[in-house]
């Protein structure tokens, strides 16, 4: 009788464990952020993945990665999660908001600001506290990109495998300057 009870409890435990487990993500969180795979990001969230994990490349977080690749739906999802650090900086001193500002990604800027990202945070890792507002004042409203900055865009695009559209970036930065002054 005792053995039947133990077997019954064990069987119930196994069945409950199997039924209650959620499927695991099939790709890493950075690839999911890069490709805009909201379903996989949700699996990472449900599975308890570290949403502030650092990538080998520049110590980017999944939020910064999603921003770099223009994945606003992933940015929205991650920015709504408890514990996600909206103002986390990579080794270059960039936050997700800094990245969105530099690349002129107005929708992502609006998403991050609505979620509470700090638009006055120190950016670029310099001593002059060049936050996104300063970044847009220096770069955002320019009608063109100077050769030094253009080279930085080219280098970053190559590093991350991005297509580079300087006209779109310039247009977006002008809008970013307006959004960050509100």
Each predicted region: which residue ranges?
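Bacterial N-terminal signal peptides
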Residues: 8-17
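Ankyrin-repeat-protein effector appendages
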Residues: 19-28, 132-182
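N-terminal segments that cap or nucleate solenoid repeat domains
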Residues: 24-58, 65
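Ankyrin repeat A-helix N-terminal signature
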Residues: 31-36, 65-71, 99-105, 131-149
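Conserved ankyrin/ankyrin-like repeat signature
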Residues: 40, 73-74, 107-108, 149, ...
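Ankyrin repeat domain, specifically the short helix-to-loop turn at the C-terminus of the second helix
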Residues: 43-50, 76-85, 110-118, 156, ...
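Ankyrin repeat boundary signal
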Residues: 53-55, 86-89, 119-123
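Start-of-repeat signature of ankyrin repeats
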Residues: 58-59, 93, 126, 134
């Amino acid at each position: 009788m005792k053995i039947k009870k133990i077997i019954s409890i064990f069987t119930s435990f196994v069945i409950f464990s199997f039924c209650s487990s959620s499927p695991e993500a099939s790709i890493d969180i950075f690839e999911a952020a890069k490709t805009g795979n909201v379903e996989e990001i949700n699996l990472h969230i449900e599975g308890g993945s570290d949403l502030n994990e650092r990538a080998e490349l520049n110590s980017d977080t999944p939020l910064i990665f999603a921003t770099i690749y223009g994945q606003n739906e992933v940015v929205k999802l991650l920015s709504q999660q408890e514990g996600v650090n909206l103002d986390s900086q990579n080794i270059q001193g960039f936050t997700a908001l800094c990245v969105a500002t530099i690349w002129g990604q107005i929708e992502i800027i609006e998403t991050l600001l609505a979620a509470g990202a700090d638009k006055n945070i120190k950016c670029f890792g310099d001593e002059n506290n060049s936050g996104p507002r300063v970044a847009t004042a220096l770069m955002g409203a320019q009608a063109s990109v100077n050769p030094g900055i253009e080279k930085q865009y080219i280098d970053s695009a190559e590093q991350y495998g991005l297509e580079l559209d300087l006209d779109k970036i310039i247009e977006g930065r002008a809008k970013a300057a307006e959004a960050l002054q509100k």
